[in-house]
Every structure is written in C-alpha cells, then in structure tokens.
Amino acid sequence: MFDLNTCLRKNILELQPYRCARDDFSEGVLLDANECAYGSVISVDGVEFNRYPDPRQIEVKQRLCDLRNKELSITKPLTPDNICMGVGSDEIIDSLIRISCIPGKDKILMCPPSYGMYTVSAKINDVEVVKVLLEPDFNLNVDAICETLSKDSAIKVFFACSPGNPTAKALKLEDIKKILEHPTWNGIVVVDEAYIDFSAPDMSALTLVNEYPNLAVCQTLSKSFGLAGIRIGFCLTSKPIATIMNSLKAPYNISEPTSRLALDALSPQSIDKMHTYRDAIIQQRVRLCKELTTIKGMGKIIGGYDANFILIQVLDRPEGGKPSNDAAKYLYLQMATMHKVVVRFRGTEPLCEGALRITVGTEEENTILLKTIKLVLQEYYTKK
C-alpha cells in the first residue's frame, strides 16, 4: 500500500523550497532579482535574456495537458499541478531517485535491457540497482517483479521503459497496473514514455496518472517533436509528488529560450507538423522492417514496432546463421567509419545477442542504409 509520507525521504518531505523573485512578481519596475537593468548584450527575437525565466512554466504545462487530455480522452484530466519540468527526462529520472532513495540504503528496480541512465543516476546517488530481466519477448516478468518487491522493502522506485529502449516495445498497461497495485510494496512506479507517440494511443500510462498516487510518467519533446537540442522533459504524476519534485528542482531550471520554443512546439500548428513527421516515420518503419529482413545475413527483428527505431539481429552466415556479436560489431563499425552511416551496437545487452538498434531515418537515409548494409555484409562474409 502506497504511503507518500513513508515512501519519500523525511528530509525531502520537510524541505522548504527556495522562493525566487519571480514567484512573487513578474511585471513592472523589477529591482528585486539583481538582474542587469540595461538589458542583455545580445538580442534575439525580442527575448529579454536579462530577466530570469518563469519558474513555474504554467503555459507550457497547460499546453501539454491540453494535448494529452484530448488525444487520450483522459477521464480525470491532467492539469499543470500534475507536472514537473526538467532539463530533458534525465533530470526527471535523477529527481525521482533523489526524492525517494536514501543514499547507501535504498534501491531502485529496473528490467534490462533498458535505458542506461536509470543505472547511471542511481550510481551517482549511491543507490543500488536491482535487476529483473524482461521476458524473452520483452514484456515485463510481472511475477518476478512483484516477488522481488515483496522481499525487499529497500526498493523505492521501479523504472519501466515503454516503449522500451532498445526493445522498441510498448509494455502492457495491465502489467503496469499489477505492479501499481502491489499489496505490500511502498514505492513509485515510473513509466518512461519518451517514444510513446510512435505507438498506439491506448498504450500510454498517462490515463492512469490520476487513478494511482504512486505513478509517475516521463515524457519529452526530444523524439516525436524533434527537439532533442533544447533539452526539455516532463514528469506527469500525482499532485503531491509533483509538488515535492517542483520544490526540489533548481528555481530556474528551464531557460527562457527553451520555454518559448516548447510553447511554440505545443501550438496547434506544430502539433500538426509533429503528426505529419510521426506518420512519415511510421511509414518508413514499415518499409525498413520489410526490407531489412530480406537482406542476406540480417536476422529477425527481435524488438517491437512501437518506437522510431528497430532492434534487429545480424547473423554469422548469410543463410541459416545464428545471431553474432562479431558480425553485428563489424557491420556497425564499418558502416560508421567507412560509409558514415551510424547505428548503435546493442549486442552486449541482455537478450540482444548480435543486435543493432537502427533509428528510422528519412526515405533517402533509409535507402542509403539498406544499400550500405548489403555492401558491408557481403564484404564480411567474403572475408570469413
């Protein structure tokens, strides 16, 4: 049974957030924040860089809520009070660990193969990482997860990546619910939805945020919106958890240029463009899935079809071969160094022997990719 007051760190619950100048007033003759009154030495599109940005970002949060409430037909609508914003999802991940886990004592649980920053953030915070492998089909092993949570009360956060990275598979909401409803575990379930816009709409855990007080969903503008360069992420969670996370964050963690770009990205016109890009990516994903598996030496797609990338195996022989890390690594390195076509080698991840993670590119990029794979694999098998 989830209890916020015993789940989170006592010192965090007692934290009095820093109150900055812009929490009180943002208009008029502003002589309260020791800013440069004469303005900024640079000027871009009328942005007042000499002023500290809005610490609450209500407009950006509201636009995200409007988008998700409409798309998902959420019965208990999300509001800005459900959101904490961060410098990419990585800041959100770190914040969730810091509010929950006492360094050197508490733990997180994750399910490899998964996003590596969960481990990195945990290690930085001196938090142990407990691992329960995904099933061979990359679904959650719910029984093993629940058993682990039952046995170890030091686990305070469970991280699930959906769609998974590198698996490209969206997790079943029924599995997420079973973990949220664990009868004895007191902790937060985090569902990282960086790639959710490339999957079916009914796969998002956002529909559950106002149903479960122990759920936190991470989203970003980096993927479907094409804004990886501005570094902005969102945690959509219960209002009590969001309040605590907003108390913990740096007072001006989202810059004014980033805020304005995010606001523009969440406008109706930009959302329409996002949908156009997303549809084109999904169309090219279908093409890649079809054509990659016809190339001699390429194995099966072992991941799902819910992201803007594909997880596929490379074989040790052109026909009748087995997944091979040597072949996959050769293909990866030769393409990158000799042909300037860069993918990611993922063969050292659990359940990913001989696997490459390939981002879905434009039609032209994918044509180059397919030709390059054929060429390099021919070279590899000829040399063997």
From Swiss-Prot:
Q: Which reaction does it catalyse?
A: L-histidinol phosphate + 2-oxoglutarate = 3-(imidazol-4-yl)-2-oxopropyl phosphate + L-glutamate
Provide the cofactor list for this protein: pyridoxal 5'-phosphate
Short name of any one Pfam family annotated for the protein: Aminotran_1_2
Record field: transmembrane: none
Cellular component aspect of the GO annotation? cytosol; nucleus
Q: Name one GO molecular function term.
A: pyridoxal phosphate binding
The family note in this entry says:
Belongs to the class-II pyridoxal-phosphate-dependent aminotransferase family.
NCBIfam families given in the database record? hisC
Fetch the HAMAP family from UniProt: HisC_aminotrans_2
Q: What is this protein called?
A: Histidinol-phosphate aminotransferase
Q: Which organism is it from?
A: Schizosaccharomyces pombe (strain 972 / ATCC 24843)
